[in-house]
Design a protein with these regions (language model features):
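Cofactor-cradling patches in redox/metallo enzymes
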Residues: 31, 38-144
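Non-catalytic terminal/interface segments that mediate subunit docking, oligomerization
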Residues: 2-60, 197
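Extreme N-terminal, non-catalytic leader segments
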Residues: 2-3, 142, 146-197
Length: 197
């Protein structure tokens, strides 16, 4: 499988136009040792120019969400072949909401394990997209990755109005991650820059 079609997609976000890649966290869910699928998706994401923080297999919701927050990721991609996916994905959405990070988009798949009714339920709950075997047949692997990239590119990036005074307290670490991203993307106003000095 070649990711060349993804790499040829025109950058659609301001950050991508500046050459700054999207950031994804990838993992297989808790008690799931089936990491072949997520490894393939991770490699295609990387081939498309996405920065990937790969957690491998058997990862808890807390680990995945905390990593996404600390890395200021735009997307999370999870494979789940072990069952328990409805609760797992809902908990991911819940923890992101609790952290004020609903801008992080959640994607997943699990072959035929996640049935159409569950896909509908989870997407209504807040999962951005769950890919079925039918999607794989119609879109192909690269097409699914292109869809993920497009959905994250159109999304809201981190709030760059984080001030130095907001780097303490419960959300201090999350705000610090957002601030670092804003600095990397050269998105701070002169006033914001001077408040950090």
């Amino acid at each position: 499988v070649s990711a060349s079609t993804s790499a040829n997609s025109a950058p659609s976000s301001p950050a991508q136009k500046k050459g700054i890649p999207l950031r994804f966290v990838t993992a297989a869910s808790l008690f799931d040792g089936h990491d072949a699928a997520i490894n393939i998706m991770r490699r295609i994401l990387q081939g498309a120019g996405v920065e990937v923080i790969h957690l491998a297999h058997n990862r808890s919701v807390a680990e995945v969400v905390q990593t996404a927050l600390q890395e200021d990721a735009q997307g999370i991609a999870i494979s789940s072949y072990q069952g328990g996916h409805v609760e797992y994905f809902k908990y991911v959405v819940d923890l992101l909401k609790e952290a004020g990070a609903e801008h992080i988009k959640v994607f997943g798949g699990g072959g035929g394990v996640i049935v159409p009714a569950e896909i509908k339920e989870l997407e209504a709950y807040g999962v951005e997209r769950l890919y079925s075997p039918y999607d794989g047949q119609n879109l192909g692997l690269v097409g699914m990755i292109d869809d993920m990239i497009e959905r994250c590119s159109l999304g809201t990036y981190s709030d760059v109005t984080v001030a130095a005074t907001e780097l303490s307290g419960d959300n201090g670490r999350n705000n610090l991650a957002r601030l670092i991203t804003a600095i990397e993307r050269d998105e701070l106003s002169p006033e914001q820059q001077s408040s950090l000095r």
